UniProtKB/Swiss-Prot annotation:
[4Fe-4S] cluster binds at C307, C367, C370. Heterodimer of LeuC and LeuD. One of its GO terms (molecular function) is 3-isopropylmalate dehydratase activity. Its cofactor is [4Fe-4S] cluster. Pfam families: Aconitase. HAMAP family: LeuC_type2 (MF_01027). Belongs to the aconitase/IPM isomerase family. LeuC type 2 subfamily. The gene is leuC. It comes from Aliarcobacter butzleri (strain RM4018). One of its GO terms (biological process) is L-leucine biosynthetic process. This is 3-isopropylmalate dehydratase large subunit. Catalyzes the isomerization between 2-isopropylmalate and 3-isopropylmalate, via the formation of 2-isopropylmaleate.
């Protein structure tokens, strides 16, 4: 019987052929922690009396949620990770000196490789599947186990094959594709499944689109999202390798067999898809942008950023739409780049000047606004159109606020009018 790409990755790591449903002990190529979750893992590590990491070069700590610190508590939280990193001389420790949201930063640093098994104490660790890796979020206790042993136990997930067909229309992005999938499946329709994204549409998706696609796999309950290695992946890795003096390791490339077993197959005609808006209070509450326009939804805040849509292409499209325009008087437009490198490139290319001229404010790379921490908190009854990944009750601030999830083009267009706007109408 054939295997899926996810089954093949686990087979290679387990040293034997394995299939969905089997329990395997797998080595971990990269363990990821952040300023919120790592201190819990560190406490378990130290209380257990352990002094050495199993694989120091395979452990990355990224301070990204509340950095620079927003208050004393977050400063103390970050200090725990910083002290641990210094004590163990961690090579892959990233703080204010080399900032970035972990799921944007690590691929940029050449630390995510096709064929990897990756775990992170953050639910959107599934982002890295865009590079043909198995990558999933786990709890802080599981992260400490990975720190101590260099491995972990997994149940090999069943796979749902998603076949995207056709060329996306203008302003239809990877964000719209995943919002449509979540609309179809619901927030638990892919529970502990691998979402394998395939079809001729993939050739039209940039790496930024693929990161967005895999980033939100968890919003359908998926264990991981994954896109097979191709020429676009290779081009991305070649550039990353050149920028970093090489990749962390050599890629191990896997492809699903034609006779691989899938628990479900979903086909989507992408050519007929228009931008998708997820209404409050679930990412699965998807509607077309046409419906949103007819609903005449006024917004108070527009947010472009996060690990979902804080990449260079997001600022490019936003700058193109906002060039020569002004943000509506009642609207605040907040931009949060995924990494310092993205910020520098967007500045060099003139995107930041264009956006600031239009009335935007630019923050440092941070997860702050997305989780309602800082740098974009919503007040009572405020409405935000956001390129983030969750729109639960109170997610970005007040429990009476509302969040509409959208791609960066829709968000930018909405900043001009002050209402959810179809960028195709501009």
């Amino acid at each position: 019987m054939g295997q899926t790409i996810t089954e093949k990755i686990f087979s290679e790591h387990a040293g034997k052929k394995v299939y969905a449903g089997e329990i395997v002990r797998s080595p971990i190529d990269m363990v990821i922690g952040n300023d919120i979750t790592t201190p819990i893992s560190i406490r378990a590590f130290e209380e257990g009396g352990f002094e050495k990491l199993a694989n120091p070069d395979g452990f990355a700590i990224v301070l990204d949620h509340f950095i620079p610190a927003k208050d004393i508590a977050s400063a103390n939280q970050a200090k725990i990770s910083r002290d641990f990193a210094l004590k163990h001389n961690l090579k892959n420790f990233f703080d204010e000196k080399d900032m970035g949201i972990e799921h944007a930063l690590l691929p940029e640093k050449g630390l995510v490789i096709p064929g990897d098994v990756i775990i992170g104490a953050d639910s959107h660790t599934c982002t890295h599947g865009a590079l043909g890796a198995f990558s999933t979020g786990m709890g802080s206790t599981d992260i400490s186990f990975g720190m101590i042993t260099g491995g972990n136990w997994f149940k090999v997930p069943e796979s749902i094959k998603v076949i995207f067909k056709g060329k996306p229309a203008p302003f239809v992005t990877g964000k719209d594709l995943i919002l449509e999938i979540i609309r179809i499946l619901g927030v638990d329709g892919a529970l502990y499944k691998a979402l394998e994204f395939t079809g001729d549409t993939i050739q039209y998706l940039s790496m930024d689109d693929r990161f967005s696609l895999c980033n939100m796999a968890i919003e359908a309950g998926a264990k991981n999202g994954i896109v097979a290695y191709d020429e676009i992946t290779k081009e991305f890795l070649d550039k990353v390798g050149e920028a970093n003096g090489g990749l962390r390791a050599e890629p191990k490339i896997h492809y699903s067999d034609e006779d691989a077993n899938y628990c479900q197959v979903i086909e989507i005609d992408v050519a007929k898809l228009e931008p998708v808006i997820a209404y409050p209070y679930l990412p699965s509450n998807g509607h077309s942008v046409s419906q949103a326009v007819s609903d005449n939804i006024k917004v108070d805040q527009v947010f472009i950023g996060s690990c979902t849509n804080g990449r260079l292409s997001d600022f490019k499209i936003a700058a193109e739409i906002l060039a020569g325009q002004k943000v509506a008087r009642h609207v605040r437009l907040i931009l949060t780049p995924g990494t310092q490198k993205i910020l520098r490139e967007a500045t060099k290319l003139g995107y930041i000047d264009t956006l600031v001229d239009a009335g935007a404010v630019v923050s440092n790379p941070t997860c702050g606004a997305c989780l309602g921490g800082y740098m974009g908190i919503l007040g009572d009854n405020e409405v935000c159109i956001s390129t983030t990944n969750r729109n639960f009750v109170g997610r970005m601030g007040s429990r009476s606020s509302k969040i509409y999830l959208a791609n960066s083009a829709v968000a930018a267009a909405s900043a001009i009018s002050g209402y959810i706007t179809d960028p195709r109408s501009l």
